[in-house]
Amino acid sequence: MMKKILAVCFVFISAFAFAQEKPDALKMYVEGNYAQAIKVCESEIAATPNRIDSYVVLCWALVANKQYSVAEQRASDGLAIGPNDLRLVESLGEAKYYLGKNKEALALFERYIAGISDSASRVGVAFYYMGEIYIRQAKYQHADISLTAAVQKEPLLDRWWTRLGYAREMAKNNVLAMAAYDKALELNPSQHDALAGKRRIEKNTR
Protein backbone atom coordinates (compact mmCIF):
# COMPACT_ATOMS: atom_id res chain seq x y z
CA MET A 1 0.00 0.00 0.00
CA MET A 2 2.78 2.39 0.98
CA LYS A 3 4.58 1.68 -2.29
CA LYS A 4 1.46 2.62 -4.26
CA ILE A 5 1.10 5.86 -2.33
CA LEU A 6 4.75 6.71 -2.93
CA ALA A 7 4.39 5.93 -6.62
CA VAL A 8 1.35 8.20 -6.93
CA CYS A 9 3.19 10.96 -5.07
CA PHE A 10 6.18 10.60 -7.37
CA VAL A 11 3.99 10.90 -10.48
CA PHE A 12 2.23 13.95 -9.05
CA ILE A 13 5.48 15.67 -8.08
CA SER A 14 7.02 14.90 -11.47
CA ALA A 15 3.99 16.31 -13.28
CA PHE A 16 4.04 19.42 -11.10
CA ALA A 17 7.74 19.95 -11.73
CA PHE A 18 7.19 19.58 -15.48
CA ALA A 19 4.37 22.12 -15.36
CA GLN A 20 6.59 24.53 -13.44
CA GLU A 21 9.38 24.17 -15.99
CA LYS A 22 7.13 24.45 -19.05
CA PRO A 23 7.89 27.68 -20.95
CA ASP A 24 5.16 30.32 -20.73
CA ALA A 25 4.82 31.94 -24.16
CA LEU A 26 2.33 34.55 -22.99
CA LYS A 27 4.67 35.67 -20.20
CA MET A 28 7.52 35.89 -22.71
CA TYR A 29 5.35 38.01 -25.01
CA VAL A 30 4.32 40.37 -22.20
CA GLU A 31 7.97 40.75 -21.20
CA GLY A 32 8.93 41.65 -24.78
CA ASN A 33 10.78 38.42 -25.52
CA TYR A 34 8.99 37.99 -28.83
CA ALA A 35 11.41 35.66 -30.60
CA GLN A 36 11.35 33.17 -27.74
CA ALA A 37 7.56 33.40 -27.46
CA ILE A 38 7.30 32.61 -31.17
CA LYS A 39 9.55 29.60 -30.76
CA VAL A 40 7.53 28.24 -27.82
CA CYS A 41 4.19 28.77 -29.59
CA GLU A 42 5.39 26.99 -32.73
CA SER A 43 6.53 24.06 -30.57
CA GLU A 44 3.14 23.95 -28.86
CA ILE A 45 1.35 23.99 -32.22
CA ALA A 46 3.59 21.22 -33.55
CA ALA A 47 2.63 19.11 -30.53
CA THR A 48 -1.05 20.13 -30.47
CA PRO A 49 -2.08 21.46 -33.91
CA ASN A 50 -5.57 22.56 -32.83
CA ARG A 51 -4.42 24.67 -29.88
CA ILE A 52 -5.96 28.04 -30.72
CA ASP A 53 -4.47 29.91 -27.76
CA SER A 54 -1.00 29.10 -29.07
CA TYR A 55 -1.92 30.62 -32.44
CA VAL A 56 -3.22 33.74 -30.69
CA VAL A 57 -0.05 34.38 -28.68
CA LEU A 58 2.06 33.43 -31.70
CA CYS A 59 0.38 36.07 -33.84
CA TRP A 60 0.65 38.73 -31.15
CA ALA A 61 4.37 38.02 -30.90
CA LEU A 62 4.87 37.94 -34.67
CA VAL A 63 3.20 41.33 -35.12
CA ALA A 64 5.17 42.80 -32.21
CA ASN A 65 8.34 41.39 -33.78
CA LYS A 66 7.41 43.04 -37.11
CA GLN A 67 7.12 39.70 -38.94
CA TYR A 68 3.96 40.80 -40.67
CA SER A 69 3.87 38.36 -43.58
CA VAL A 70 4.40 35.41 -41.25
CA ALA A 71 1.76 36.80 -38.88
CA GLU A 72 -0.68 37.06 -41.78
CA GLN A 73 -0.10 33.42 -42.71
CA ARG A 74 -0.21 32.04 -39.17
CA ALA A 75 -3.35 34.01 -38.28
CA SER A 76 -4.98 32.59 -41.41
CA ASP A 77 -3.84 29.11 -40.36
CA GLY A 78 -5.37 29.62 -36.93
CA LEU A 79 -8.64 30.89 -38.38
CA ALA A 80 -8.85 27.77 -40.53
CA ILE A 81 -9.05 25.85 -37.24
CA GLY A 82 -11.11 28.34 -35.25
CA PRO A 83 -12.87 30.60 -37.77
CA ASN A 84 -14.76 32.52 -35.09
CA ASP A 85 -11.81 33.41 -32.88
CA LEU A 86 -11.94 37.20 -32.87
CA ARG A 87 -8.49 37.51 -31.32
CA LEU A 88 -7.05 36.02 -34.50
CA VAL A 89 -9.32 38.23 -36.61
CA GLU A 90 -7.84 41.30 -34.92
CA SER A 91 -4.27 40.03 -35.28
CA LEU A 92 -4.83 39.32 -38.96
CA GLY A 93 -6.13 42.86 -39.32
CA GLU A 94 -2.95 44.25 -37.78
CA ALA A 95 -0.74 42.14 -40.04
CA LYS A 96 -2.62 43.27 -43.13
CA TYR A 97 -2.50 46.89 -41.96
CA TYR A 98 1.29 46.81 -41.79
CA LEU A 99 1.42 45.09 -45.17
CA GLY A 100 -0.57 47.96 -46.67
CA LYS A 101 -3.69 45.86 -47.34
CA ASN A 102 -5.99 48.60 -46.12
CA LYS A 103 -9.34 47.37 -47.39
CA GLU A 104 -8.86 43.86 -46.01
CA ALA A 105 -7.53 45.17 -42.70
CA LEU A 106 -10.44 47.56 -42.28
CA ALA A 107 -12.98 44.79 -42.85
CA LEU A 108 -11.26 42.63 -40.23
CA PHE A 109 -11.19 45.40 -37.63
CA GLU A 110 -14.87 46.10 -38.27
CA ARG A 111 -15.64 42.40 -37.83
CA TYR A 112 -13.66 42.31 -34.59
CA ILE A 113 -15.40 45.35 -33.10
CA ALA A 114 -18.84 44.13 -34.16
CA GLY A 115 -18.33 40.75 -32.54
CA ILE A 116 -16.27 41.40 -29.42
CA SER A 117 -17.30 42.73 -26.03
CA ASP A 118 -16.92 46.50 -25.71
CA SER A 119 -14.66 45.89 -22.72
CA ALA A 120 -12.23 43.64 -24.62
CA SER A 121 -8.61 44.69 -24.25
CA ARG A 122 -7.88 45.39 -27.92
CA VAL A 123 -11.00 47.32 -28.90
CA GLY A 124 -9.11 50.60 -28.60
CA VAL A 125 -6.28 49.21 -30.72
CA ALA A 126 -8.73 48.17 -33.44
CA PHE A 127 -10.31 51.64 -33.50
CA TYR A 128 -6.84 53.19 -33.67
CA TYR A 129 -5.83 51.15 -36.71
CA MET A 130 -9.15 51.94 -38.38
CA GLY A 131 -8.40 55.62 -37.86
CA GLU A 132 -4.95 55.24 -39.39
CA ILE A 133 -6.41 53.46 -42.41
CA TYR A 134 -8.92 56.27 -42.91
CA ILE A 135 -6.06 58.79 -42.75
CA ARG A 136 -4.27 56.80 -45.45
CA GLN A 137 -7.45 57.02 -47.52
CA ALA A 138 -7.85 60.76 -46.81
CA LYS A 139 -11.22 60.07 -45.14
CA TYR A 140 -10.52 62.43 -42.29
CA GLN A 141 -14.02 62.64 -40.82
CA HIS A 142 -14.09 58.85 -40.58
CA ALA A 143 -10.62 58.94 -39.04
CA ASP A 144 -11.84 61.46 -36.46
CA ILE A 145 -14.68 59.14 -35.42
CA SER A 146 -12.45 56.07 -35.14
CA LEU A 147 -9.61 57.82 -33.33
CA THR A 148 -12.05 59.51 -30.94
CA ALA A 149 -13.33 56.04 -30.05
CA ALA A 150 -9.73 54.87 -29.64
CA VAL A 151 -8.74 57.59 -27.17
CA GLN A 152 -11.94 57.03 -25.21
CA LYS A 153 -10.74 53.46 -24.67
CA GLU A 154 -7.07 54.35 -24.08
CA PRO A 155 -6.95 57.99 -22.93
CA LEU A 156 -3.30 58.03 -21.82
CA LEU A 157 -1.59 57.43 -25.17
CA ASP A 158 -0.19 60.72 -26.43
CA ARG A 159 0.50 59.27 -29.89
CA TRP A 160 -3.16 58.47 -30.38
CA TRP A 161 -4.25 61.98 -29.34
CA THR A 162 -1.70 63.38 -31.77
CA ARG A 163 -3.10 61.35 -34.64
CA LEU A 164 -6.62 62.42 -33.69
CA GLY A 165 -5.42 66.01 -33.81
CA TYR A 166 -3.93 65.42 -37.25
CA ALA A 167 -7.16 63.88 -38.59
CA ARG A 168 -9.13 66.86 -37.32
CA GLU A 169 -6.57 69.29 -38.71
CA MET A 170 -6.83 67.67 -42.14
CA ALA A 171 -10.63 67.89 -41.86
CA LYS A 172 -10.23 71.66 -41.22
CA ASN A 173 -11.66 71.28 -37.73
CA ASN A 174 -9.00 73.43 -36.14
CA VAL A 175 -10.62 74.02 -32.75
CA LEU A 176 -10.99 70.32 -31.97
CA ALA A 177 -7.61 69.60 -33.56
CA MET A 178 -5.96 72.02 -31.13
CA ALA A 179 -7.80 70.38 -28.23
CA ALA A 180 -6.44 66.96 -29.24
CA TYR A 181 -2.91 68.30 -29.70
CA ASP A 182 -3.12 70.00 -26.30
CA LYS A 183 -4.16 66.73 -24.69
CA ALA A 184 -1.23 64.95 -26.34
CA LEU A 185 1.16 67.59 -24.99
CA GLU A 186 -0.41 67.38 -21.55
CA LEU A 187 0.47 63.68 -21.56
CA ASN A 188 3.87 64.19 -23.18
CA PRO A 189 5.22 67.77 -23.41
CA SER A 190 7.91 66.64 -25.86
CA GLN A 191 5.47 65.09 -28.35
CA HIS A 192 7.07 66.52 -31.50
CA ASP A 193 4.21 65.86 -33.93
CA ALA A 194 1.68 67.52 -31.63
CA LEU A 195 3.89 70.59 -31.30
CA ALA A 196 4.30 70.73 -35.07
CA GLY A 197 0.56 70.38 -35.56
CA LYS A 198 -0.19 73.25 -33.20
CA ARG A 199 2.33 75.46 -34.99
CA ARG A 200 0.75 74.69 -38.38
CA ILE A 201 -2.70 75.60 -37.14
CA GLU A 202 -1.48 78.78 -35.46
CA LYS A 203 0.36 79.81 -38.63
CA ASN A 204 -2.63 79.11 -40.88
CA THR A 205 -5.14 80.93 -38.68
CA ARG A 206 -3.24 84.19 -38.28
Describe the residue ranges of each PLM region.
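N-terminal leader/linker segments that initiate helical-solenoid repeat arrays
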Residues: 17-56, 206
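Helix-start (N-cap) detector for alpha-helical repeat units in TPR-like alpha-solenoids
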Residues: 52-53, 86-87, 120-124, 158-159, ...
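Canonical tetratricopeptide repeat
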Residues: 57-60, 91, 125, 129, ...
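Register position in tetratricopeptide repeats
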Residues: 30-31, 64-65, 98-99, 132, ...
